[in-house]
């Protein structure tokens, strides 16, 4: 009995030692030089999820939104001066320089989420639903100088949500996700076109320059990120494996991706007992290789990055 207890204790200590060594190695992160712009992200480090901003490469992080109400899904305006975000069915906007916040849509007639700016920096496309439980469609919202907001439906959802809108660089159309496929809708005329098919379940489309889309995907137990040529619809796999990336955002110069890394099937099973990180923001290069952690914690989640100038 004593011998079995001793062997068990040694096994536990060995597992703990291996776990601590793995965590120490996995927490090392040296970011590459020359990272452009700044990143807005969501963190619950101070309680409710709030927006934070960090000018890269090494300025201190700064909180942008305050209060007990959870906010999320930030999108930086084309000129880098403002951030649109979702807040309990409403769309808010915060100015980066001053922290001044305004509410764009009130969440009364429509519950809005997932804002994305058009290139003019004035209009936004959002995922909107009448009430909780109904499918979301895409709407174009246009603020007026008098404070009113015009709204025009772009899509009519079928069974599930039309979600994750991404406006094209020329402002002529919007990419989005419908039933795990990438779609496009033209702002002028509303013509719908399917962009992807096959077995991959796509999510989080973003434009990588004017000629490509980049998106995360899952297929069975595999997950990855693909770049899609808009002219030929050819897919190039940037990364594939057991790491689940929930969202992604290209840098302004297209050399990097800021991604929400949700989990990794290759993480040792004992890591969770030792305080493995929660959802975190990682840096990938344009080839899909991880280059380091941007925002990570073993106590608080960090996620949903968007890159500004």
Question: What is each PLM-predicted segment?
Answer:
Residues 2-309:
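Sequence signature of WD/YWTD-type beta-propeller architectures
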